[in-house]
Amino acid sequence: MGFYRNLVLVAASCTQALGLCPAPRCDSPDIRHEWGELSREDRLSYISAVQCMKDRPPELSVEEVPAVRSRYDDFTAVHINYTLQIHNSGIFLPWHRHFIWLWEKALREECGFTGTLPYWDWVMWPNLAASPLFDGTETSLSGDGEFNATEQPTELNPEPGLTITIPRGAGGGCVRTGPFKDWVINMGPFAFNESYEPALPDHAFDYNPRCLVRSLNDWVIQTYNNQTVVDTLLDSPDIVEFQNIMGGFPNPPIPIGPHAMGHRSLGPDMLDFFASPQDPAFWQHHGMVDRLWTVWQDADEPWRRFALNGSSTTWYKDDTPEVTLQTTVEFGILDEPRPLYELMSPTAGPYCYTYT
């Protein structure tokens, strides 16, 4: 399958999602666990598989995508390629569900991983540096970056007349502890404003090797990813409000969404709108996003399982179609195109997993 800069949206003929075709469900789903629930051996096994993906050669060619140097980079490149469709859109939730499943599948098939994709429960770890995910030990996802005195607070304006000052994080420099110390990332950085453009920037796949930077920010995770926020999210009466709260767009009851702020809590590279998969914690963060969507869907199966809302492009750009269950999305070299109705249940279609 080729690598394209444009997402193709076509109609699928099957009406399985409407109950007119069989929708088989698996009987014995794999269970995805929170990182803190894993044994030492299971954490080390997952870390080893991630490092394996970094060591394996890419399937994309350097001639086609100059920045790729590893199989891991293939996944980042695919995410970049579809960024202008898959964020703050009706595609966001199902596309990322499938993307992290493809990552889990690659870990198993290409790197001998026998476990399931762990997730990061934001609520459990209000002190990030003390958490088993980011304490910098050999069984963590590495720790904070070195202190960078030049990092400054950030001002956000999520709504007219509303300014939020985000205090700076604790680090701001290269990650030097844990299994991913001196981790090299090759793509980006991207300016956030580039997400509003109609096409990817010319530098999208330029080779730019540098260290992974983190700046752990407890204020962010405690303010925007706490139990109250999660409860509000799960109390959403419909997919419109669920997406608004999760993403903070377009009309959120809370000003910033836990998806974006989970990214922000780890610093600039995890916050990169296009290239965030380069931080190994990306997969655990999006595991939590998918877990909450799953819990919300399960709470009202008949009405929520196949609920979709939104445009097929980031920021609901003008003259782009609304998504339907027949909308087909692409994953580049990672997989064949998939209609959204195949991606709506973690225990049907290609999937067979659940969460603790």
Swiss-Prot record:
Endpoints of the signal sequence: 1-19
Phenotypic consequence of gene deletion: Impairs the production of Asp-melanin. Results in yellow fluorescent conidia and accumulates aspulvinone E in conidia.
Cofactor note: Binds 2 copper ions per subunit.
Subcellular location: Endoplasmic reticulum lumen; Golgi apparatus lumen
The keyword Glycoprotein is assigned to this record: yes
Cofactor(s) listed: Cu(2+)
Binding sites annotated in the UniProt record for Cu cation A: 87, 96
Top-level taxon in the UniProt lineage: Eukaryota
UniProt record similarity statement: Belongs to the tyrosinase family.
Name of protein: Tyrosinase P
Top-level taxonomy: Eukaryota, Fungi, Dikarya, Ascomycota, Pezizomycotina
Protein encoded by which gene: tyrP
